[in-house]
Amino acid sequence: MKARMTALYAIGHFCIDLACAFFMFHCVRDSETWVTAALLYNFCAFALQMPLGLMADRLRRDRSFAVIGCVLVCLAALLRGSPLPLSILAGVGNAFYHVGGGVAVLHTYPERLGPLGLFVSPGAFGIFLGTLLGKGTLPMLPVCAVLLLMAGLLLVFAKGVRPPEMDMELRTAPLAAIGCLFLVVLLRSYLGFLFTFPWKTGAWAVIAACGVVLGKTAGGYVSDRIGMKQTALLSLGAAAILFLLSGNPICGILAIFFFNMSMPITLRAAADALPGLRGFSFGLLTFALCLGFLPAWSGLPAPSGGWFLALGAAVSLLLLLPGLGRKR
């Protein structure tokens, strides 16, 4: 039952991110308000997860949040002639789904990272595929139908585990460790916009997207086997070395794979640091994602070259280790 629930939430994550990317590129990309709409979407999709996560902690209705997310994104399709309202509604729906699904998996597997990595990983490929489809001629109706089907499946099959009552105070939280985790995610988000390798076209672009997905998945399951610190050392250390050779597509894809292995580690560590506020911890790190893409959207000049990505991976490791505290 737990495995089925996690698989459903993971598939839903793929569908919700695909739908949002599809709607944005199908309905908004060519409008005069594209830049504003994209900023509004990203703010709603990522920054709003923090207050929504706190709300989920209070209400303890994880599945309901995920279902609401599917419905809201579906309703956004009705606003195809209004780019800004569509972007806002799609972003809010995306935030609802991520909070609902993420917190449900955190509650269901309080000691494991593998299922968490499985949940977060499909979103990257959903965005990639949704962007491609959004630039084509696929009608919106099939996408909406899939979202409604997903909402129905979650209602029927994703029963989940009711979280235990726990302390929901911040005063006893290890704030320094949480701050380190926040900075790791912010840096990961920023560096992700610098993965503009000259070889990243055609089939190599598809393989690179798969590298993101598989890296996040592997990070969770490897951490369950050898521990979070060992996984962080191996993955980010390997990423730092391989980024120096990222002009070669094989080395670049391996670097992306290893770099993304830290994703479930940061989410699990933050949730463990705030055990009664898992929704808030999830949203706090997605707020860091939101801040991380602001430099790219603002048009600030970005450093180029594998050396900067290698430096970023090394700094991420130096921040992540104290963020993990005494965890093995």
Segments from the language model and where they lie:
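Symmetry-related core transmembrane helices of the 12-TM Major Facilitator Superfamily/SLC fold
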Residues: 139-159, 305-325
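Helix-loop boundary and gating motifs at the non-cytosolic
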Residues: 1-42, 184-200, 297
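C-terminal transmembrane helical hairpin of 12-TM major facilitator-type secondary transporters
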Residues: 229-266
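Intracellular juxtamembrane helix-capping segments at the cytosolic ends
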Residues: 94-110, 260-276
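Central cavity-lining transmembrane alpha-helices of secondary-active solute carriers
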Residues: 35-57, 206-219
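Cytoplasmic membrane-interface "Motif A"-like loop-to-helix N-cap segments
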Residues: 57-70, 224-237, 277
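Glycine-rich segments within core transmembrane alpha-helices of 12-TM secondary carriers
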Residues: 45, 111-134, 279-299
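Conserved MFS/SLC helix-loop-helix module at the cytosolic interface between two early adjacent transmembrane helices
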Residues: 47-81
